[in-house]
Curated annotation (Swiss-Prot):
Belongs to the delta endotoxin family. PANTHER family: ENDOTOXIN_N DOMAIN-CONTAINING PROTEIN-RELATED, PESTICIDAL CRYSTAL PROTEIN N-TERMINAL DOMAIN-CONTAINING PROTEIN. Coiled coil: none annotated. InterPro entries: Cry1Ac-like_dom-VII, Cry_V, Galactose-bd-like_sf, Pest_crys, Pest_crys_dom-III, Pest_crys_dom_I, Pest_crys_N_sf, Pest_cryst_cen_dom_sf. One of its GO terms (molecular function) is signaling receptor binding. The keyword Flavoprotein does not apply. Promotes colloidosmotic lysis by binding to the midgut epithelial cells of Coleoptera. Toxic segment of the protein is located in the N-terminus. CDD domains: delta_endotoxin_C (cd04085). Keywords: Sporulation, Toxin, Virulence. GO terms for biological process: sporulation resulting in formation of a cellular spore; symbiont-mediated killing of host cell. This is Pesticidal crystal protein Cry7Ab.
Amino acid sequence: MNLNNLGGYEDSNRTLNNSLNYPTQKALSPSLKNMNYQDFLSITEREQPEALASGNTAINTVVSVTGATLSALGVPGASFITNFYLKITGLLWPHDKNIWDEFMTEVETLIEQKIEQYARNKALAELEGLGNNLTIYQQALEDWLNNPDDPATITRVIDRFRILDALFESYMPSFRVAGYEIPLLTVYAQAANLHLALLRDSTLYGDKWEFTQNNIEENYNRQKKHISEYSNHCVKWYNSGLSRLNGSTYEQWINYNRFRREMILMVLDIAAVFPIYDPRMYSMETSTQLTREVYTDPISLSISNPGIGPSFSQMENTAIRTPHLVDYLDELYIYTSKYKAFSHEIQPDLFYWSAHKVSFKQSEQSNLYTTGIYGKTSGYISSGAYSFRGNDIYRTLAAPSVVVYPYTQNYGVEQVEFYGVKGHVHYRGDNKYDLTYDSIDQLPPDGEPIHEKYTHRLCHATAISKSTPDYDNATIPIFSWTHRSAEYYNRIYPNKITKIPAVKMYKLGDTSTVVKGPGFTGGDLVKRGSNGYIGDIKATVNSPLSQNYRVRVRYATNVSGQFNVYINDKITLQRKFQNTVETIGEGKDLTYGSFGYIEYSTTIQFPDKHPKITLHLSDLSNNSSFYVDSIEFIPVDVNYDEKEKLEKAQKAVNTLFTEGRNALQKDVTDYKVDQVSILVDCISGDLYPNEKRELQNLVKYAKRLSYSRNLLLDPTFDSINSSEENGWYGSNGIVIGNGDFVFKGNYLIFSGTNDTQYPTYLYQKIDESKLKEYTRYKLKGFIESSQDLEAYVIRYDAKHRTLDVSDNLLPDILPENTCGEPNRCAAQQYLDENPSSECSSMQDGILSDSHSFSLNIDIGSINHNENLGIWVLFKISTLEGYAKFGNLEVIEDGPVIGEALARVKRQETKWRNKLAQLTTETQAIYTRAKQALDNLFANAQDSHLKIDVTFAEIAAARKIVQSIREAYMSWLSVVPGVNHPIFTELSERVQRAFQLYDVRNVVRNGRFLNGLSDWIVTSDVKVQEENGNNVLVLNNWDAQVLQNVKLYQDRGYILRVTARKIGIGEGYITITDEEGHTVQLRFTACEVIDASNAFISGYITKELEFFPDTEKVHIEIGETEGIFLVESIELFLMEELC
């Protein structure tokens, strides 16, 4: 069983360290053989490393500084701030000693590296200067707070702020001199703490000090930059120092652990509160908790021989727990064993702590969990439970002891005194040895009395073994401690921000885990597992249940998705989140910039005093890592939500306009104007009637400005395909919607199409008269969702984007009001959370998951005669396509300059050259086509065809006409192109020729335009399209096609057929009257084709004269074998020949 399985513990008989094998200890020297016990103890005590009794001034000072800092987090009030400065200066710059020098010395001792004297002296001198100026600033600040309207106090505090700030900016690099970053690290962290506290004052008081808003913003942005910079520096060099001390022996681990413990106290604890100096994020007093765990030294006398004892890695893996949820010690069950003395004349027997197991609770939980056994229970002589239930153990006094043998020593702990706020608990194997090991030497209190000013509480005990050659392993306990701020209850206050670390959960999701934190978060992190459920926190609400709270979560991830907060198993908050980094590693490797905040716009009230808070993820973009640092509760007043709506709307309205409110900002879209109007609509008219009315007038004015700058006609889609307005033209498959959750006004719904030649489309041409030369215009709009939606803007050429946008703006269950109408106010939070056009991604020419879109078009010179204009087109050409979009606009973006100007001039020149080439080409085709058409008709009025005109000749003329390019736009075949007038003129003459051809033809459906209609056919006959013509196909020798027609007797007719034979055999067309008079046309594959008579390769036209003797005649089409294709069969009077 894993003792750090955070989902819950079980009782276990697991014994730690029973199988460790260590090298046999070397025999003691003869002088030690003859030494008595007290002499031996004197030697072992002299062998203790210098840092053993580390209850020194440096550590004492930093725990006091940390305590003072924790009490002044956020914006606690003016008196707290001045008292903070007063206390800090007293701690860091006392009159009787140089604390900063002791900071350096403490770390120098731990890492055995001295700071070069010049760098040391320079840093100390500059620190002295900072202290002097901080004292002056503190006094100036206090004077101003007492006399805020006095110009003299204002001037003085401003001057002292700027001087002190400049000194910090100048001196901070001296506290990170290259090569000495680690021994200077405590100095750096403490100085950074003061600088960030100072910069907070600029944001808090800058407006009262008459700083410009730019100056306040500059200082605030500098503070945010320094929070990140200082945090990352502290963690980087802490890790560097720790890795430097990595070793292989027990003694090396002792020093390694001391460095870790003391640098957590001196550096990382302070770095953990840096973010809370941000007065905009933490705008009131803030309660936070340091949940990291530190380990005091093993309770043991020094090992006399380095060859015995566990290795470095064994110590780290055995004594140090893996990351876990915060737990609280409830009971130690301790086993006592005995070492028999070598001689009672020298020393007594040792009754020692040989094994134990730990029972504990997690935050605000009654369930008790018990670990397996640490140590060895075999041969124990007694055991007992030592209860600490609800009793913070803030200090331990222990009696480490040793039994001396001629060739070995056996170590053990005879007794431990546990000091608790509710009383003491005493473990006593015996009482023959003194209580010499005091935990407050390593974890000092923040003053006297200790039971009130203690800084840490005992939370757990592990154990290690020291090997002897002849005896079983001795068990040495190691105590772990949490900071006092990590209290058992997760109290949520009515008057300050509560920051609850995620590791204060009492239950994790099945696959969620606790991972090592990066160092600047004050503890470890919770990492999500394979599903969305992260875990549960129990809280205690120390406020009336009517109190409202804002909620935010600090997290790090490279995925996007939705973060859900449940209270008492009821979903209460939902919000989309974006990735904070592109790539992410393990929790310990994260930097300050890896983290972001999910902040909910909706406030909450707790349903009871002890709610269960569940954190849950959904809609994740992939299965990557997600880390939770903390969840925060910010108390707000009862009208906070309405006030927030008002302030949000006011800010949104102000951002719509340029200075003077004469125009809209360039980046303001028509969609944004609509969304701002929704914000205004959501303002409470009861609480803020005047403000709402004023904002409504402004947003209506903004909408008028939006209409006025939009070059598109009919932006609300009221007159599509109107003959009265030259606006939008569209196909079938378009529906106009009105007023839903996303769009306030009209919007478009496109459906897919069954035929790519006839897409669903909507287009409009912007007239040249509306445009300015050498100007850029932008097409903008908003898409709720789409697939295969193509957007075009066209002038010299077409700019084209395919827009695929996920339907991810709103939850599955949409909020509605009591009338069943869209509740836009409730839905607004979902729209706020979704990405804008800047968050889009382009792949293979497809713009994905960007709800806002924009396409540029640059204009060159203006020519009103050409009226090139700008074409705007939307279309869907697939069956699966769909789109829901609106707020379309084309607006002026600004002049085209620089490279863009050169590019548009080049485009225009290229377009004009192509147009000239097209004009020349078209003129030549027009001449040919006109001549071909003139040859078809018998007169200038095109009222009769010449008698010898064949179908092939008409089709040939049509082919010439169809070779005219740019008759229709390439991007949409229904939109006329530059050659449309010419093409139309010629096409109408072609159609006239076909009409006359059909009129004179006695054979019904002789061109098979209506398939097999009017023909009697066998089942294997078909009609297929070929090169724009319908062709009759006979595939078998027994296929037969028949038609009876009625003619004039004694009149002459011409039978004219255009056909093609494929393969052997022949095809034929026979005409027979009722008296048996028959004529026949035959076609074979080997006939020589008259090029002048051919239309398509292989097709030829033949004709013959026929004089019927009866009115009724019979026409038959057939073949002997192979394939026979008939394009046209014509029978007409030959009266024109007479």
